[in-house]
Amino acid sequence: MAAAAAPAVAVNGGVKVASQAYLESKAVKETRVLISDLCRQFYNLGWVSGTGGSITIKVHDDSIPKPNQLILMSPSGVQKERMEPEDMYVLAANGSILSSPSPKPYPHKPPKCSDCGPLFLKAYEMCNAGAVIHSHGMESCLVTMINPLSKEFKITHMEMIKGIKGHGYYDELVVPIIENTAYENELTDSLAKAIEEYPKTTAVLVRNHGIYIWGDSWISAKTQAECYHYLFDAAIKLHQLGLDWSTPNHGLIQNVKALIGSNRDINTSVKAGLKDSNHGMQSLPGCIVLDIEGTTTPITFVADVLFPYARDNVGRHLYATYETAETQDDIKLLRTQVEDDLARGVNEAVSIPPDDAGKEEVIAALVANVEAMIKADRKITALKQLQGHIWRTGFQNNELEGVVYDDVPEALEKWHALGIKVYIYSSGSRLAQRLIFGKTNYGDLRKYLSGFFDTTVGNKRETRSYIEISESVGVDRPSEILFVTDVVQEAVAAKGAGLEAVISIRQGNAPLPENHGFKTINSLSEI
């Protein structure tokens, strides 16, 4: 085993990591053995067959900062299942080779450090990794070929997602896909760009090739590698069954060509229509605007979950964040609203003392006003903005989770596949809307939404609000917009602005007046 001449690096005034003594230390020897053991295991899994694939691990030493720790790397072009501990390369943190394996007799080729070396070093540099695995597992190759144009692999609602760092069962796991090249080292820039654009990822797929996976330690990298390969295999098998692995309910794959007709022009055929036995098939507008309460989400969720949470936590929130610019802005808006309420004689409005009266007195008055506003279900910006900030804390602390009807995710996915833009218009703040759809009982649905509107564009029962929306969503005519709501007065206002409007009928919604004149639906799947 040859040791290359390299500058010795002193760590904390102790042993030099590039010294011969350190290269022969127990930590280095144990890491050599570990890599050879893992390569045999990975060979049996099909990850490193045909001399392909590789693994690298940093030599863990508590006395040495991770960026300065030695790197052990398997060689290239060798039978991975037959490697011995002495076959490993030892590199300094900057990538210079400190020790290389001795040549073996014919038919073995001369030793060569892994072709993956530059990519391994990039993962160490950008992700502070402790180990990196490069797999040629068949499943990691096939998932990139199912959709040859896709730049991402996505999957959600699978138990093994929990094994990926920073992810849970309801989360959407996204793995970037980069294009393969003739030589491994040519992938380095693409890998770096993917890591930069996907800061949460711990893996990058290479189309028609394999995957790079890293972790804080060899255990983390190995565990995640096993989970990634499981999820890829699951996606392939779901695809074979005609099921969509990327959606929460893993329903049937929506074949867009079959849905819109393979012999028809997409621009005209996407108007799939509104199915209503009383009115026949109507053409679907270019974009859809959805209300939340009673349309996508049960009214009870807002009334029985969100409002009580805001009411019960307003005091705690104001005390904890009183000095922040955000909360001071909230207080300023509330002051203006309360002053207007007092001038108009609104019941239960309480004068808010000036700031110099003391934090406790100001907060007590704010709490009294906010509780009264919530009780009266007032649709005012000052209240909605503060509620959004309170709810944000609840969602971040996993104390809140959005609820949508079972038909909502599939409908959103279908419209998204057809290129139909979908917006939300609610009396709740845009922040609150993003929170509700960002963490639902079906995962993150924001990827299907093009934007959010709140009362800053106007009251939902005023026609001018819908005129403002129609001028913001990029349609040629207001009639190209379909507005879905459970409130007749809102439908009337939308119709007055030239929008198409339908009424959502859900359990718990308020009864509709007779002869209201609008189409009705019981599920978004009817659109």
From Swiss-Prot:
Pathway in which the depicted protein is active: Amino-acid biosynthesis; L-methionine biosynthesis via salvage pathway; L-methionine from S-methyl-5-thio-alpha-D-ribose 1-phosphate: step 2/6; Amino-acid biosynthesis; L-methionine biosynthesis via salvage pathway; L-methionine from S-methyl-5-thio-alpha-D-ribose 1-phosphate: step 3/6; Amino-acid biosynthesis; L-methionine biosynthesis via salvage pathway; L-methionine from S-methyl-5-thio-alpha-D-ribose 1-phosphate: step 4/6
Binding site for Zn(2+): H134, H136, H209
Keyword Zinc in annotation: yes
Protein residues bound to substrate 2: S426, S427, K460
Residue span of region Enolase-phosphatase E1: 288-527
Cofactor binding note from Swiss-Prot or TrEMBL: Binds 1 zinc ion per subunit. Binds 1 Mg(2+) ion per subunit.
Keyword presence, S-adenosyl-L-methionine: no
Active site, renumbered: E159 (proton donor/acceptor)
Required cofactor(s): Zn(2+); Mg(2+)
Organism domain of life: Eukaryota
Sites where the protein binds Mg(2+): D291, E293, D486
One Gene Ontology molecular-function label: acireductone synthase activity
EC number: 4.2.1.109, 3.1.3.77
Catalyzed reactions per annotation: 5-(methylsulfanyl)-D-ribulose 1-phosphate = 5-methylsulfanyl-2,3-dioxopentyl phosphate + H2O; 5-methylsulfanyl-2,3-dioxopentyl phosphate + H2O = 1,2-dihydroxy-5-(methylsulfanyl)pent-1-en-3-one + phosphate
Alphabetical list of Pfam families matching this protein: Aldolase_II, Hydrolase
A GO biological process held by the record: L-methionine salvage from methylthioadenosine
Region ranges (Methylthioribulose-1-phosphate dehydratase): 1-244
Keywords: Amino-acid biosynthesis, Hydrolase, Lyase, Magnesium, Metal-binding, Methionine biosynthesis, Multifunctional enzyme, Zinc
UniProt binding sites for substrate 1: C116
Record's GO cellular component terms: cytoplasm
Family listed: In the N-terminal section; belongs to the aldolase class II family. MtnB subfamily.
HAMAP family the record matches: Salvage_MtnB_euk, Salvage_MtnBC
PANTHER family named among the record's database cross-references: ENOLASE-PHOSPHATASE E1
Protein name: Probable bifunctional methylthioribulose-1-phosphate dehydratase/enolase-phosphatase E1
Source organism (scientific name): Ricinus communis
